[in-house]
Amino acid sequence: MKRAYGLEIPETVEEAIDLDRTALLVYDMQVGILRQLRHGGEIIAKVADVLAVAREVGLRTCFLRHMSLPKNLMGVFQMRQALAWQRKASMDDVHPWFLQGSDAHAVVPELAPRETEAVFDKIGMSAFEGTPLDTALRDCGVRVFVIVGVALEIGIEPTVRQGADLGYIPVVVEDACGAGDDDAGKRALASLRYMGDAMFTTVSEITTLLRRAHRNQSGAP
């Protein structure tokens, strides 16, 4: 831990983790997204491991969901995105995949949010853009967020970048973050490492650190 001008500047994930100042972000773990991914089941299992320990230690947890608007309200951004993602040439063939209340929009049942956990819907890629997430985290005194989910190259990378710009310390759980395209996911991680804004960890390490922080905080042996 570095100290300067009254500030504590963590250099490791262990130094960054303070249960009262840390939140877990579960990004876009939705039925309609996971069923498109080759390794969807593996990512669900990894995210479930992190979520279980976060719940065990009482970590604040927020879920993010990608939301489609009805077709007549999609606007230029969502229409262009839908044409690209659905590989369609005509707007007549495009369908809003993630309408609120649809099966595709729901979080996968293995990770079903609890009443004590927030769920924020978004139409953009960054979890902070157009959602109350930043306000909610700041009001709870959160300074660090641990992020898991999908997809690295689409939404997790911009969330980490914007979070860092907002003054948070992002902690990316690499093996609990999936990608739609493996090469693109690797490039996203490499780019985040190059920037130096985020910290990186694994499911094994972060679950160990969360439990250790909980023992230290509670005074348990």
Over which residues does each language-model region extend?
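Active-site-adjacent betaalpha module
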Residues: 1-23, 49-57, 81, 85-221
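Von Willebrand factor
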Residues: 54-73
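Conserved protein kinase catalytic core
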Residues: 34, 71-72, 127, 181
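Glycine-rich loop at the start of a catalytic domain that most often binds anionic cofactors/ligands
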Residues: 73-80
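Active-site loop/turn elements of alpha/beta-hydrolase fold enzymes
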Residues: 29, 66-68, 175
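Short, contiguous, helix-prone interaction/anchoring segments in small proteins
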Residues: 21-53, 62
